[in-house]
From Swiss-Prot:
Organism lineage string: Bacteria, Bacillati, Bacillota, Bacilli, Lactobacillales
Pfam families referenced in this protein's UniProt entry, alphabetically: UPF0223
Organism: Streptococcus pyogenes serotype M1
Recorded family membership: Belongs to the UPF0223 family.
Transmembrane segments: none
Protein name, UniProt field: UPF0223 protein SPy_1248/M5005_Spy0958
Record-linked InterPro entries: BH2638-like_sf, UPF0223
SUPFAM superfamilies: BH2638-like
């Protein structure tokens, strides 16, 4: 789903943290719109998890992002963990 939508960001995050979260969400978008390298996605997820530490917050961001974009961070990370390396796509 290409288009204009907002990213679920916490305004208490620093500029660097927001940049890291956006980097991860952009990788998720890439997994649906083209293809993404699993290792790069998992690296960005690792950084993302240093910012979004709680499972509850991670699930809320996934729900919010999926609601506005149609893309699931959970499904992308699950697929990346399953293949570990190489490119993959969840797009149609």
């Amino acid at each position: 789903m290409s288009g204009n939508y907002y990213y679920p960001l916490d305004l208490s995050w620093s500029t660097e943290e927001i940049s890291s979260v956006l980097h991860f969400l952009n990788k998720v978008e890439l997994a649906y719109e083209k293809k993404v390298d699993a290792k790069q996605l998992l690296d960005s997820y690792k950084t993302y998890k240093t910012i979004v530490k709680s499972k509850a917050q991670e699930k809320q961001i996934d729900r919010d992002f999926q609601k506005v974009s149609g893309y699931s961070t959970y499904q992308v990370v699950k697929k990346a963990k399953a293949i570990e390396k190489g490119f993959f796509s969840l797009g149609n």
